[in-house]
Regions:
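Rossmann-like adenosine-cofactor binding region
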Residues: 140-178
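Phosphate/diphosphate ligand-binding glycine-rich loop within oxidoreductases
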Residues: 1-99
Length: 178
């Protein structure tokens, strides 16, 4: 995960944070979260693909925004409670600002997991039309095979919410008509 390196650099560069550590818990199943979620030595957890939706059932509380989004990527341990938040929405908004994107006519969302729920939430809040694409067709989603170039016409923002293109699959890309 990119997060470990990022946070360790932050902790090591700040004398007030030098006692902190960041550990990856790579789990094969969400059920394995039980092995460490109640560890009193942990200050919190980050949640990544594919558990941002499934982790909700293990929490005591969830922020209103995370509830609306339907996905959690940050768990804080406060007063003996496991509280879930979604900070992906903040990161998504900030990445748009940093990219100087001024106009979005529509959004094409690749993938159907927790990250896609964040982008859907953003689109709904900003009245931006969107389409969801995935490998498999479903009620709310087109399959990659069903689309053509016309879906990408205009000021379309394409958001990859799949694990494809991230470590270790950095040279792969979703199967869409580029």
């Amino acid at each position: 995960s990119f997060s470990r390196k990022y946070f360790l650099e932050k902790f090591n560069s700040n004398p007030y944070l030098s006692d902190y550590n960041y550990i990856n818990f790579d789990i094969e199943s969400i059920d394995l979260i039980k092995d460490f979620i109640d560890d009193k030595d942990l200050g919190g957890l980050n949640v990544t693909i594919p558990y941002k939706i499934e982790v909700i059932e293990y929490l005591d509380e969830i922020s209103d925004e995370a509830k609306e989004i339907g996905a959690v990527n940050t768990i804080c341990f406060e007063d003996g409670k496991r509280i879930g938040y979604n900070t992906d929405i903040y990161g998504f908004k900030e990445s748009l600002k940093a990219s100087s994107i001024n106009r979005i006519d529509s959004v094409v969302i690749l993938g159907t997991g927790g990250a896609s729920k964040t982008v859907i939430y953003f689109c709904k809040k900003n009245n931006i039309p969107y389409k969801i694409l995935s490998r498999k067709k479903s009620k709310d989603c087109l399959s990659y095979k069903e689309i053509n170039h016309s879906i990408f016409e205009g000021n379309v923002l394409i958001v990859n919410c799949t694990p494809i293109g991230t470590h270790p699959k950095i040279n792969e890309c979703p199967d869409i008509p580029y």
